[in-house]
Amino acid sequence: MSLLSRMRKINDMLQKSGVQHVNFREMAETLRDVISANIFVVSRRGKLLGFAIKQEIENERMKKMLEDRQFPEEYTTGLFKVEETSANLDINSEFTAFPVENKELFKTGLTTIVPISGGGQRLGTLILARLNDSFNDDDLILAEYGATVVGMEILHEKTQEIEEEARSKAVVQMAISSLSYSELEAVEHIFEELDGKEGLLVASKIADRVGITRSVIVNALRKLESAGVIESRSLGMKGTYIKVLNDKFLVELEKIKAS
């Protein structure tokens, strides 16, 4: 397959990421197929975002690492010393992707490290590993292009996370601002009683203890539920089951109580 054909396959991956969520496993599989190497996409903190294996490595430590989807902290920290593509590192390199405890088995193994950057920051690392053939210039062009595409997807995910967090916070603030003073007081007591994200409460008991009417509690819960902040379910004589759906709710409630 020509360099152009292989670049087009990576480009297809880029086009797809613009219109739908592309998972990192699919990205790793595409890079594995066009570069013919084991591919590991590693986050800043060493989390294995995605990987694809061309040549199986029979080693228990490596298998566990892939199962846990986490690279060792020391190795991950070391990767940040690599600021530009480092190609064809042998088994004696501190960055080898092959198990050093089996040096004799993997003595021909070569590793290439490609930093993943975007938005002026280091986002992670693309690691490529081969047992025999060295990585040539075409492979490195594809690897660096692939790292750029992966970086764009990481940035896209980060942006989505920030937007989702802002939306969640706005929904909670609107829900809380819709409560009357007595309803807000009732809500504070309800979640003191729950002492967590979900649980069972008896509205009449709280009403009697705090000195508010049961209808105030019911109205407060109804408003929070219609905003999608909580879900509640009546269990008859046992009380009402409540579950917090929006993680920002309890945080905002604590801020109000502390102010």
Curated annotation (Swiss-Prot):
Residues 1-155 are annotated as: GAF domain. It comes from Halalkalibacterium halodurans (strain ATCC BAA-125 / DSM 18197 / FERM 7344 / JCM 9153 / C-125). The gene is codY. Coiled coil: none annotated. The modification Phosphoserine is found at S215. NCBIfam families: codY_Gpos, PRK04158.1. Pfam families: CodY, HTH_CodY. Belongs to the CodY family. DNA-binding global transcriptional regulator which is involved in the adaptive response to starvation and acts by directly or indirectly controlling the expression of numerous genes in response to nutrient availability. During rapid exponential growth, CodY is highly active and represses genes whose products allow adaptation to nutrient depletion. It is found in: Cytoplasm. InterPro entries: CodY, GAF-like_dom_sf, GTP_trans_reg_CodY_C, Transc_reg_CodY_N, WH-like_DNA-bd_sf, WH_DNA-bd_sf. This is Global transcriptional regulator CodY. GO terms for biological process: negative regulation of DNA-templated transcription. Keywords: Cytoplasm, DNA-binding, Phosphoprotein, Repressor, Transcription, Transcription regulation.
